[in-house]
Structure formats: C-alpha cells, structure tokens
C-alpha cells in the first residue's frame, strides 16, 4: 500500500493508480504456443511457455511498465500500417493466423502486403513490424535482423512457411527518433522446419513428463537470470 503522505511525489501517487489499473487489466492466458517464443535461446524456456498454456506452471504477472511498452508497440504498428497505406501499399487484411498440432502451435502475423509502389520488391509478402529503442534500431540497421534476434528471425520464417509466402518486409520504428527502417527477408524453409521440430520435441517431452535440455548448466547464465521460469527450472 502506497503511503500518501505529504512527502509522496505527485508522480508516485498518480502512477500508483495507473499501475494498479494496468495490473487489474488481466489478459486471458494464452491457450497455445505462439510463434514469437519458438526461437527463444533456450528450448526449455519454450517448454515452460507451453506448459503455462496447459496450466502446469504459473506465468509471472506482466509488469505495468512492460505493459505500457507493449501498448506503445501496438500504437506504432498501427501508425506504420497507416503510413504504408498512405504511400500506396495495399493490404490483404491484417492478423492472418496459422495453427498446427491441433491448435497447440499458432500465431498471428501483422499483415500481408499484396501490392504497392514500384520499389524493387515482389508481392505478396509478409509484413511484420517492431518498435525498438535507438540502440536496437541501430543494431538492426547495421547488422540486419538475423544477427539482432533469433526469436524475431525464427518467428517471421514460421509465418512465411505456414502462410505460404516467399518473402517478408520487416519494418522497424525507432521509438526515440521515429526513423523507419525496412528489410526484405527471403524465406529459408529450413529455419521454419527446425522451429516446427522444436515444437514437436517440446510437446512430446511434456506428454511424457520429461524436460528438454536447458541451454546451459550454469544458473547464473544471463539468459537464466532474465527468464521468468528460472525458479521452477532450477529448483
């Protein structure tokens, strides 16, 4: 309980109520394993995410600040859609869905571009969008998405494979400067195949009451330190 005495700053008082409202705005637990997690650096992390969909482990509540970051990303994604439409790009609808393994593995892409200005790209193509801070934005501009994030890289290849698309336009919004960066990525079907095999291993192991290997034998490893399932994994 926040102590609303005269020394409490107005920022803390107002944010207390905002954070409380966001915390109470509980989202329904996801009932499927999403494409955004299958490229995680640890296969056991993927398994725990799957187990959470079955109610076998508890997910940690989302921090209100993180919820605001998610909301910001959704706002910028919608604006990017509007900007592209203004520039003459045409959409084949939004939030196209795929599912596999009896709906255990599923996902929704941001959109599919079906036509647009003559700018050297071929349609149709998957469209995905991310809003990143300046550091992440510059890293993608410099080295490309593949080097920046395995999770994002695997996610778009899963979408392309299941939605039968051969390429993706990946748009990144710089949250600090509002710069835009676009990268065209061709489908590598092997990436999607390995992701599906990973999902299959996780499902099979869970049904057998087994745990897939961790990415490390050191619980102080940086990936473990930021994993919400670390306490369950190492107990």
Named regions from a protein language model:
Residues 92-93, 126-128, 167-172:
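A structural signal for short, well-ordered beta-strand segments and their strand-loop junctions
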Residues 44, 130, 196-198:
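Basic side chains
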Residues 135-141:
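Active-site-adjacent loop/helix micro-motif of nuclease/hydrolase catalytic cores
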Residues 130-133, 174:
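Short, small-residue-rich loop/turn micro-motifs
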Residues 5, 139, 146-153, 158-235:
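Metal-dependent nuclease catalytic regions and adjoining charged, substrate-binding loops involved
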């Amino acid at each position: 309980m926040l102590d609303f005495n005269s020394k409490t700053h107005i920022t803390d008082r107002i944010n207390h109520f905002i954070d409380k409202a966001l915390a109470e705005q509980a989202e329904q637990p996801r009932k499927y394993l999403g494409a955004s997690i299958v490229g995680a650096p640890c296969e056991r992390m993927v398994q725990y995410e799957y187990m959470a969909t079955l109610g076998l482990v508890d997910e940690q509540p989302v921090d209100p600040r993180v919820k605001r970051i998610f909301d910001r990303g959704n706002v910028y994604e919608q604006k990017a859609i509007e900007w592209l439409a203004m520039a003459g790009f045409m959409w084949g609808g939004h939030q196209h869905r795929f599912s596999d393994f009896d709906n255990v593995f599923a996902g929704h892409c941001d959109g599919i571009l079906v036509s647009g200005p003559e700018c050297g790209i071929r349609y149709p193509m998957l469209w995905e969008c991310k809003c990143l801070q300046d550091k992440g934005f510059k890293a993608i501009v410099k080295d490309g998405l593949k080097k920046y994030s395995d999770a994002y890289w695997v996610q778009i290849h899963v979408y392309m494979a299941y939605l039968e698309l051969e390429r993706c336009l990946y748009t990144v919004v710089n949250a600090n400067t509002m710069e835009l960066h676009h990268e065209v990525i061709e489908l590598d079907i092997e990436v999607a195949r390995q992701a599906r095999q990973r999902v299959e291993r996780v499902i099979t192991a869970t049904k057998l009451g087994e745990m897939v290997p961790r990415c490390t034998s050191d619980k102080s490893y940086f990936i473990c330190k930021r994993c919400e399932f670390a306490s369950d994994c190492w107990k």
